């Protein structure tokens, strides 16, 4: 059966280009009815180019159809908003008539648009959940460390510990300058940072520009004789050399219970020193930083210390939890960072990291880390791994038990969880928001397996849990939470439809057939495909109709095709309660709810769309055909329908 497709809507100045392509082309006149649009879009089994007048349709209606807006201009006028285009085509590409360049531009942008979908779900989760499972750097970037608990199983970065493997080299990309990267991966939950050896504050100001939110939530005590005055109210400059803990203690208020971080990046000038003197000085500076941090371990949650590898020692000792390479460092910079887990108050539970202790270091092993991981052309993924490893609490969400509201985004169907489907459904049942991959097209960028859409629908819907495809979830949040998910959101609806999303939300009252619930693009085509490939699948429905009875073809084809994810509980309530009303009452409920639809049959406006027995007959027939293969309980739905 076909997978979800996108409608690649181009404005008129690009319509000549798409005529040279090989995808279908859909010309819109502006005179189409709701049903015309629904039926025509349902005939396409691949992405399709479209152009013409769409000004009478709202953004939610067009997103419901899978529209992506492409133009050389900034905006497109729709019925309810002026929409910022999703893909802005450079004018030189438009003038060149180069179809490959045009389609590459669309493809590259669509990959970036996936982030908009994930960010929108996370924004909802940040309002509703405390615990986040399966987390990566994207969650850390926007989480509130004083409120949210971030769990996951991130990749472990290269680390030096006694008797442990360093790790193997991996592909990487360039990143920020070394010291900016250092602040980027180490600053997360700390509210007070004591930064010794801050230099001229350029690093701190670059970090402020890169991550203004994280910069603002920290009180910075910076220590360096050359540090200039700073106008930022959360930066306190101390123009001193730090020789002992006394130099820092006098600037700390122990009446405040805050998480503190200690950063030591001290390096004196070489001046006239010979090699031996210079190495001895550097070694002493690094050890002094460790000793001060360790002595003040009750005041700081952790420390990050400069760690220069001596040339003249085969082995030496330091106080450390981990040594690790530096993202953005030059390939010939034989200097690491030393992370020390200390005993001070922390918002993040870092008990899985060992306490800092005296560690023996073998010089050739740590030099190997430099050779494997340093270089100006490297560092981006190393920095991400360090950020995740230091600040994400390592727990498997499938096994975690807690009463806190939780979010489970983009990890449940990782291939490592194959065979654990019952646990996945249990998590979706108790999660505030969860996602699972249901797409059947080949996956090139992710290592996920697909859950069957029909099983997800039958397993995932409860009185207090909505189960929708990803596009339906975004449309639902646009409707119910317009302050969280804005109408102008840029995302790829076809990509989103590859996910099932569960939301701990009640059924809307009244249970209207909003776009988020009812789209079923291509349902008529799916029905025809079933008939021309295997007519026995329709025999029972045909026989019932000949007898003057009915079976909900809508429900039956939805389940048999495996092409849709929508919320059964809400849909049944919509059929039995809302559709049983007359035309006037139906329209009144739609208006009162500010709901929108993309299918409306005027001939059915005064009648129920189905009756209870139609739904029961469809489920029974589905059970008869697929019951042995269906992993979900159909009997429980039959029982529910009898009493709903």
UniProtKB/Swiss-Prot annotation:
A single Gene Ontology CC term: viral outer capsid
Subcellular location: Virion
Coiled coil: none
Keywords: Capsid protein, Outer capsid protein, Virion
InterPro entries in the record: Orbi_VP4, Orbi_VP4_C, SAM-dependent_MTases_sf
Function of the protein: The VP4 protein is one of the five proteins (with VP1, VP3, VP6 and VP7) which form the inner capsid of the virus.
The family this protein is said to belong to: Belongs to the orbivirus VP4 family.
Protein name as annotated: Core protein VP4
Species in which this protein is naturally found: Bluetongue virus 10 (isolate USA) (BTV 10)
Lineage, uppermost ranks: Viruses, Riboviria, Orthornavirae, Duplornaviricota, Resentoviricetes
């Amino acid at each position: 059966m076909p997978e979800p497709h996108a409608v690649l809507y181009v404005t008129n100045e690009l319509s000549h280009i798409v005529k040279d392509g090989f995808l279908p082309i859909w010309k819109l006149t502006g005179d189409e009815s709701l049903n015309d649009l629904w039926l025509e879009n349902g005939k396409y089994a691949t992405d399709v180019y479209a152009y013409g007048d769409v000004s009478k349709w709202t953004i939610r209606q067009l997103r419901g159809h899978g529209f992506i807006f492409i133009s050389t201009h900034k905006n497109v006028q729709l019925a309810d908003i002026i929409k910022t285009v999703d893909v802005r085509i450079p004018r030189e590409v438009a003038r060149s008539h180069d179809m490959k360049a045009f389609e590459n531009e669309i493809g590259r942008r669509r990959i970036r648009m996936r982030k908009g979908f994930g960010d929108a779900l996370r924004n909802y989760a940040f309002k509703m959940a405390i615990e986040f499972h399966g987390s990566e750097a994207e969650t850390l970037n926007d989480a509130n460390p004083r409120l949210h608990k971030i769990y996951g199983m991130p990749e472990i970065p290269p680390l030096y510990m006694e008797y442990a493997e360093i790790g193997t080299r991996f592909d990487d990309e360039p990143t920020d300058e070394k010291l900016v990267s250092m602040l980027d991966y180490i600053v997360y939950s700390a509210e007070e940072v004591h930064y010794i050896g801050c230099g001229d504050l350029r690093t701190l100001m670059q970090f402020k520009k890169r991550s203004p939110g994280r910069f603002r939530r920290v009180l910075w005590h910076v220590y360096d004789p050359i540090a200039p005055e700073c106008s930022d109210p959360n930066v306190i400059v101390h123009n001193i050399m730090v020789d002992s803990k006394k130099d820092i203690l006098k600037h700390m208020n122990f009446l405040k219970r805050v998480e503190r971080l200690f950063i030591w990046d001290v390096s004196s000038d070489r001046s006239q020193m010979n090699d031996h003197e210079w190495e001895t000085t550097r070694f002493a500076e690094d050890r002094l930083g460790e000793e001060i941090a360790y002595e003040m371990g009750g005041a700081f949650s952790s420390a990050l210390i400069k760690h220069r590898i001596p040339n003249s020692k085969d082995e030496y000792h330091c106080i450390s939890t981990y040594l690790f390479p530096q993202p953005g460092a030059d390939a010939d910079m034989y200097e690491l960072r030393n992370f020390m887990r200390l005993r001070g108050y922390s918002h993040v539970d870092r008990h899985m990291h060992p306490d800092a202790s005296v560690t023996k270091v073998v010089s050739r092993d740590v030099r190997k880390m430099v050779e494997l991981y340093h270089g100006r052309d490297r560092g981006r993924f190393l920095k991400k791994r360090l950020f995740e490893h230091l600040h994400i609490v390592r727990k498997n969400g499938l096994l975690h038990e807690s009463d806190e509201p939780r979010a489970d985004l983009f990890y449940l169907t990782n291939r490592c969880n194959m065979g654990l489907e019952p646990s996945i459904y249990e998590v979706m049942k108790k999660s505030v928001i969860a996602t699972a991959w249901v797409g059947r097209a080949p996956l090139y960028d992710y290592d996920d397996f697909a859950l069957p859409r029909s099983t997800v629908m039958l397993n995932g819907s409860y009185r207090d849990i909505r189960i929708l495809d990803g596009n339906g979830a975004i449309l639902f949040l646009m409707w119910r939470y317009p302050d969280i998910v804005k109408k102008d959101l840029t995302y790829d609806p076809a990509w989103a439809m590859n996910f099932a999303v569960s939301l701990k939300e009640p059924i809307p009252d009244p249970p209207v057939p909003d776009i988020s619930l009812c789209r079923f693009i291509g349902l008529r085509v799916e029905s025809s495909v079933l008939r021309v490939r295997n007519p026995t699948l329709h025999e029972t429905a045909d026989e019932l109709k000949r007898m003057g009875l009915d079976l909900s073809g809508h429900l039956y084809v939805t389940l048999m095709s495996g092409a849709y994810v929508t919320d059964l509980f809400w849909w049944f309530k919509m059929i039995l309660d809302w559709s049983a009303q007359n035309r006037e009452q139906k329209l009144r409920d739609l208006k009162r709810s500010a709901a929108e639809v993309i299918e409306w049959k005027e001939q059915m406006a005064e009648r129920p769309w189905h009756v209870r027995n139609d739904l029961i007959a469809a489920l029974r027939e589905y059970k008869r055909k697929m019951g042995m293969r269906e992993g979900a309980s159909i009997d429980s739905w039959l029982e529910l329908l009898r009493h709903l």
